Amino acid sequence: MITLALSKGRIFEETMPLLAAAGIEVTEDPEKSRKLILATTRPDVRVVLVRASDVPTYVQYGGADLGVTGLDVLLENGNQGMYQPLDLRIAACRLSVAVRADYDYASAVKQGSRLRVATKYVGLAREFFASKGVHVDLIKLYGSMELAPLTGLADAIVDLVSTGNTLKANHLVEVERIMDISARLVVNQAALKLKREPIRRIIDAFASAIPTA
């Protein structure tokens, strides 16, 4: 049995064409089913649904043989014990700094002000601001980042941005682009040795179906 870890939402939806290229289709809609383990049209392949931030953990410790997760999750939480054969070029977005539209971020940085920054990417944010010599106090949040500048909790946020519509709707503007993000295929190293042929076939099928830029 080969177990693939996925999270619900955009990554799940955009992984489906890649699975189809490998001759694998999930037999139930995760949005309608309460099951966390989903069967597929291949009796030897199943999909487990976990939180996006937990995908690398399941793969690293052998709860899943393969997984699809964002580069942001891998960089923030570490990627030990995993093979990363493919950038799948799906779920593309960017990690950015955003502030209120009326906040002069450039002046604050130039003056050496100490900024309060809200984010769930504390490690990546710390590394980014340290590289620029900007002093920050980081506030860990798990969602609704846009509220932080609006309520005075923080001067800025570091979050994923796709279209920018959510920022615009909340009167925020993107002021720095930290990095581009996309989903990666990750594979448990022990599983790759023990189940080499079936896993290799899935990797090759994914590779052939990756969207072109």
Swiss-Prot record:
Signal peptide: none annotated. It is found in: Cytoplasm. Its EC number is 2.4.2.17. GO terms for cellular component: cytoplasm. GO terms for molecular function: ATP binding; ATP phosphoribosyltransferase activity. Pathway: Amino-acid biosynthesis; L-histidine biosynthesis; L-histidine from 5-phospho-alpha-D-ribose 1-diphosphate: step 1/9. It catalyses: 1-(5-phospho-beta-D-ribosyl)-ATP + diphosphate = 5-phospho-alpha-D-ribose 1-diphosphate + ATP. It holds the Pfam family HisG. GO terms for biological process: L-histidine biosynthetic process. It is an enzyme of class 2 (transferase). InterPro entries: ATP_PRibTrfase_cat, ATP_PRibTrfase_CS, ATP_PRibTrfase_HisG, ATP_PRibTrfase_HisG_short. Keywords: Amino-acid biosynthesis, ATP-binding, Cytoplasm, Glycosyltransferase, Histidine biosynthesis, Nucleotide-binding, Transferase. Lacks the C-terminal regulatory region which is replaced by HisZ. Belongs to the ATP phosphoribosyltransferase family. Short subfamily. Heteromultimer composed of HisG and HisZ subunits. Catalyzes the condensation of ATP and 5-phosphoribose 1-diphosphate to form N'-(5'-phosphoribosyl)-ATP (PR-ATP). Has a crucial role in the pathway because the rate of histidine biosynthesis seems to be controlled primarily by regulation of HisG enzymatic activity. This is ATP phosphoribosyltransferase. It comes from Variovorax paradoxus (strain S110). The gene is hisG.
